[in-house]
Amino acid sequence: MYDAIVVGGGFSGLKAARDLTNAGKKVLLLEGGERLGGRAYSRESRNVPGLRVEIGGAYLHRKHHPRLAAELDRYGIPTAAASEFTSFRHRLGPTAVDQAFPIPGSEAVAVEAATYTLLRDAHRIDLEKGLENQDLEDLDIPLNEYVDKLDLPPVSRQFLLAWAWNMLGQPADQASALWMLQLVAAHHYSILGVVLSLDEVFSNGSADLVDAMSQEIPEIRLQTVVTGIDQSGDVVNVTVKDGHAFQAHSVIVATPMNTWRRIVFTPALPERRRSVIEEGHGGQGLKILIHVRGAEAGIECVGDGIFPTLYDYCEVSESERLLVAFTDSGSFDPTDIGAVKDAVLYYLPEVEVLGIDYHDWIADPLFEGPWVAPRVGQFSRVHKELGEPAGRIHFVGSDVSLEFPGYIEGALETAECAVNAILHS
């Protein structure tokens, strides 16, 4: 019998299991895969032997991500500044300026008016209340419709749409304007804060922090997929794929939201919550690391290509670099190397593409999706409730974070809440 069973070994599960263990609780962590870390996934590059790369979450900002900063300090995990952008090759229209902020002076007044509207709408969001509790349905519309209402000139319109595509992992007709505004609110109500959070990276990969946290958890079982959680009796029974069952007083579900529909909950979860879980969120974000020859250090490209953003990741050799591109898996097939080359050459016709590296999070049955991005109309219907306890079952992870959804910080935030709830129950 355990005091708590934690299902899932990403950062939320690791923090929950570690903190409960350090509070004197007997804890079992069950992870379905062969590794810990979840969507924070550092491994050797498939193209550059000996080079460690981040296939999943990679960036942090100490001001915006204080819990993650505290974990790094706790274990002495080194970080480095993210690649500084010093050269710009945008495709935003003939009047765009090739610099970090490419908006021409002729569009400044329109950008000022649109910025006012964006910040006004973002300030309607109280991060603690949940999007379903604030009468925000009028903002939960397709992003392209919202941007149309901003009446932006061509360059600033495309600049906004490109970065939104990068951050949300959805084309504008499928993305929710409310979710874009939620990200602005999460970054201290700063539009630039969303982009400037790409500030630091793990010097040696996120696995350093994963390994350090896991050392404080005595009992971890890998390749143990949970199929059922039954709290109808005096204790909570957790059943795994091979039929074995474990018992605990409390359970923390720390797996991605899109996998919860594969778990049989007894009794069933509340209907309103269950409907969104069955649908799954609509995130399709695709991060591709591209090995190239002939690219400048510090290059940044933003534009109307199938890669809305393409920028420097790291040096490989004097003439070779890794670039990172963002798009979505519904719009682009990363297995089509010809399409990858065309997408890169659209911005950088002088470079040679040598190889690509990525992880298909949607096809991976342990994730069934990348970082969270709701379908239009989902989170104004059910949002905060997704992360609320259901009896003795607690739900954590960056997918259900109110403060920092989609970030490691959000995973740590939700774990903190669940641990406090269990310790004070």
Swiss-Prot record:
Enzyme's top EC category: oxidoreductase
Location(s) in or outside the cell: Cytoplasm
Phenotype for N166A: 30-fold decrease in kcat/Km and kred for (S)-6-hydroxynicotine, with larger effects on the kcat/Km value for (S)-6-hydroxynornicotine
Keywords from the UniProt entry: Alkaloid metabolism, Cytoplasm, FAD, Flavoprotein, Nucleotide-binding, Oxidoreductase, Plasmid
Keyword Calcium tagged: no
Biophysicochemical property: pH dependence: Fairly stable between pH 6 and 9.
Keyword check for Flavoprotein: yes
Induction: Induced in the presence of L-nicotine and D-nicotine. Expressed during logarithmic growth and stationary phase.
Pathway: Alkaloid degradation; nicotine degradation; 6-hydroxypseudooxynicotine from nicotine (S-isomer route): step 2/2
Domain of life assignment: Bacteria
Catalytic activity: (S)-6-hydroxynicotine + O2 + H2O = 6-hydroxypseudooxynicotine + H2O2; (S)-6-hydroxynicotine + O2 = 6-hydroxy-N-methylmyosmine + H2O2
One Gene Ontology MF term: (S)-6-hydroxynicotine oxidase activity
Family: Belongs to the flavin monoamine oxidase family.
Domain topic, free-text comment: Consists of two domains, an FAD-binding domain and a substrate-binding domain. The inactive D-stereoisomer binds in mirror symmetry with respect to the catalytic axis, revealing absolute stereospecificity of hydrogen transfer to the flavin.
Task of the protein: Involved in the degradation of L-nicotine. Catalyzes the oxidation of (S)-6-hydroxynicotine (6-hydroxy-L-nicotine) to 6-hydroxypseudooxynicotine. Oxidation of the pyrrolidine ring of (S)-6-hydroxynicotine leads to the formation of the optically inactive 6-hydroxy-N-methylmyosmine, which hydrolyzes spontaneously to 6-hydroxypseudooxynicotine. Acts with absolute stereospecificity on the L-form of 6-hydroxynicotine. Can also use (S)-6-hydroxynornicotine.
Protein's name in the database: (S)-6-hydroxynicotine oxidase
Source lineage: Bacteria, Bacillati, Actinomycetota, Actinomycetes, Micrococcales
Gene name of the record: 6-hlno
